Amino acid sequence: LVGSEMCIRDRDIYDYIVVNLPGINKMLQSNPDVCIQKVDDQWLVAHSRLPDDRDFNISDLGYYTIPKLYGLMDTSSIDAVNATNITSQPFLNSKGQGVIVGIIDTGIDYLSENFCDTAGNTRIMAIWDQTLEYRQNLYVNYGRIYEQAEINTALEAYRNGLNPYDYVGTTDITGHGTFMAGVIASRKIDDYIGVAPEASIVCVKLKNAKKYLRDYFYIRDDAVCFEETDIMLAARFLKDYAGLKKMPLVIYMGLGSGLGSRTGGSPLSNVLDSLTMHVNTCVVVPAGNEAVKRTHFSGYASVVPEYKEMEINVERRGKGFVLEIWAKSLDVLSVSIISPTGEIIPRIPARIGSSTQYSFLLENSRIYVDYQITETVAGQEVIFMRFERPAEGLWKIDVYSLTNLPGYFNAWITLKELMDCDAYFLNSDADVTLVEPASGLRLITVGAYNHNTNGSDVNSSRGYTCLLYTSPSPR
């Protein structure tokens, strides 16, 4: 790390995702106003104030440079996975002995007996709480790491009527991380048992996303969401910890984002995918619950002057939402906009590196449009549109192809769990509704199961990826 822990946690400091190239790395290290953290051989996380000559938008900074925000995926009872039958087969040796389960989520209730062995000692090897004040350690540059011995001391204090948080001061306020840890690794208590009841646990409690990012993506005030940068660093920590302990590692991340190309090209997908190349390491992520939430649209954009009309209905006004339109392959697209009252913004030229703002006087709404002609990571054009205080009613986006052939495209809007208004596509497409990072080629992507009907949940997001692969891919 170059810099300090305060640089990382400061709410006025911006976080950036940077490609780890020798020239860029050297330039950043020589800048006293920048803190950097290495994620892996391909990616860095940088922390600094916004340069005076830059605006905070993807045209000035680059699409992948701005961290995307990830929300909690819905949870439901999965008793019907029949974990008891799985763990009771002695020849399978499938109770998780000698394996680390790494959980990236909202934390864990370490006081729960579900995470203790039969002797009453914790099976939690470590907790990295990113929200707490820094204490020096071997692994990370911010937050606090509690090791197994400290957790056992806190458990003993708790059993003796003392305050355990005087010893280990981390909690799971939402309970989401604890629930997921229980599904995966709870020991048998009464009639409940996790899938790997003897596995060791390492948990990362993510810090909340900074306000400037929540404002930029129009996130609902009460929504729980996290930065892509913190998740990338959490994955690196789990890899380093398991490597030092010389133990196999299974990472589970119960989070998802509605934005991204669905090609496996996002920085987080790339980081998680590269981890699976290590021996004895696999990564499990949720497919999401977007199939019937009407957050995806696809179609063919006709050659100018023809176009493909895309309709978004706003039923409840709020801060806003984000719309991304991804062209397939090397096609180039442009858009025009029609407001609910009929005000028209003519076709907006696809200018490289330009961010344009349009105001709608009758609606008291504003739309920001950014074009990235060749998005560096995924290799596709993305049109990034931010709808600020969109008026209720039907917004029409006309999509044009600037090449000689009709151009296929996908469009996604902000996850409903994070959106501050109620918006959806009128003619939505339930396919390719995977959340990011589920499109990673080597990630194990898990769909939702309805335990009441013993079948797939109708809400469960669907594939394929935009490269027409399954996840994990047989490639």
What do the PLM-derived regions correspond to, one by one?
Residues 389-401:
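Noncatalytic modules at the cell exterior or secretory-pathway interfaces
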Residues 401-410:
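Short acidic/polar inter-strand loop motif in beta-rich domains
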Residues 89-227, 319, 330-331, 439-442, ...:
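Subtilisin-like serine protease catalytic core
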Residues 128-129, 133, 139-151, 278, ...:
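Extracellular S/T/G-rich loop segment that most often corresponds to the catalytic His/Ser-adjacent loop
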Residues 235-262, 286:
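Short acidic, glycine-rich surface-loop motifs adjacent to enzyme active sites
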Residues 9-100, 107-123, 393-394, 433, ...:
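Autoinhibitory propeptides
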Residues 1-11, 469-474:
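Conserved small/polar residues in nucleotide/adenosyl-binding loops
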Residues 268, 272-296:
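Catalytic cores of secreted or luminal carbohydrate-active enzymes
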